[in-house]
Every structure is written in C-alpha cells, then in structure tokens.
C-alpha cells in the first residue's frame, strides 16, 4: 500500500484515500480525445444523413467498395491495438527490447492500414471517378475517412518519435507517461475506426 501523496510511475499522484490525481498531460489528452469524439460523431452523423439523400446518384456505396481490401486494412489497425498494449506492458516490466519490438510492429501495422486506405482511394478515384467534389457521397466519405486517415498518420509519426526516444533510452520504465497517453490516442483512433467501418462499409452499403 503506497503512502498518501506519493507520485506513481504513470504520471499521477496517489492522494489521501488512495485516489489517483491525473497529471496535466493525461488531463490534456483526455480533454483532447473528448473533443475529437464529438468531432468524429458529427462527421459520422453528416455521412449517414447525406448518404440517405444521395444513394441513387452514381457512383454510390453499393457499387464502389472493395471489402477484401478494406477488411485486410482494418484487421491491421485492429491488431495494432493489441500490439501497442503489449508494448506498454513490456515497458512497465523494464523489457526495453520487447517494448521496441512490439511498438515497432504497431507502427508497421499503422502504415499497412494507411497503404490499404491509399489503394482503396486509388480504386475509387481511378476506376469510379469518385472524388470529394463528385457528389454528396464523395464529399462526406472522403471527409470522414480522410480525417480518420489523418489521425492515423499523426499517430504513426508520434509513435515513430517515441520509438527513436526509446532506442536512445530517453524513454524507460521510469518514464511511461508519454507512452501511455500515445497509447490512449491510438486506442481512440482504433475505436473510431470500428464506428466508421460499421457505418460506412456495413450499414451504408
């Protein structure tokens, strides 16, 4: 049992009664993720609403999506939630090499997701002529999926920076707050994709 008022290794403080007070970094990340959840919720509602107005105008969702490609890319992203969790646990166990391995795999899976998204867009634009200005479907689809891809890209960049810092031993088991908040962000990005995938590729078709 830790003494009251002692700082923990996660960037919080154990206050009297053992309540955890989050660090400013964690509070900031939670606030950011809350605002991003509202942002994506608005985009998803806009996609569903406008899609109902434009389903008869070609090209439309029932024609253009290639589910095998989308499923493969999605599997990579969903798997990355597991690998980043394992990486964080490895760092807490002071297993730096295991952390680097699992964290690096998470980056690769994120890149594979982006590759799959790029190939899907190539198909939509090249074969079907679907662009963000083509019709309401194109506008709402590329806005929603594009912003998600942007968030994945940002996540991959930040994780790559963390990987470099960890290799140079600037991130260790005694300093896991940065890794933890990046993990929160990545789990959020994965969670958003579950909802986006459901509405765009399942319900929307």
What residue ranges belong to the model's regions?
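...captures the hydrophobic TM-helix bundle architecture rather than a specific catalytic motif
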Residues: 1-205
């Amino acid at each position: 049992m830790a003494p009251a008022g002692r700082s923990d290794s996660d960037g919080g403080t154990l206050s009297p009664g053992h309540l955890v007070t989050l660090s400013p970094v964690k509070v900031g990340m939670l606030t950011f993720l809350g605002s991003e959840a509202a942002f994506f919720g608005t985009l998803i509602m806009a996609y569903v609403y406008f899609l109902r107005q434009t389903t008869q105008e070609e090209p439309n969702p029932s024609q253009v999506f290639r589910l095998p490609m989308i499923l493969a890319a999605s599997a990579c992203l969903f798997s990355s939630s597991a690998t980043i969790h394992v990486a964080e646990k490895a760092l807490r166990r002071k297993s730096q090499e295991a952390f680097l391995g699992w964290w690096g795999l998470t980056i690769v899976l994120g890149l594979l997701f982006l590759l799959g998204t790029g190939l899907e867009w190539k198909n939509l634009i090249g074969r079907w002529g679907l662009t963000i200005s083509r019709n309401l479907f194109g506008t709402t689809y590329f806005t929603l999926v594009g912003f998600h891809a942007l968030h994945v890209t940002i996540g991959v960049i930040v994780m790559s920076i963390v990987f470099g810092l960890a290799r140079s031993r600037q991130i260790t088991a005694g300093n896991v707050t940065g890794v933890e908040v990046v993990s929160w962000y990545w789990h959020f990005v994965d969670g958003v994709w579950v909802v986006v995938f459901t509405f765009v590729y399942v319900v929307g078709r």
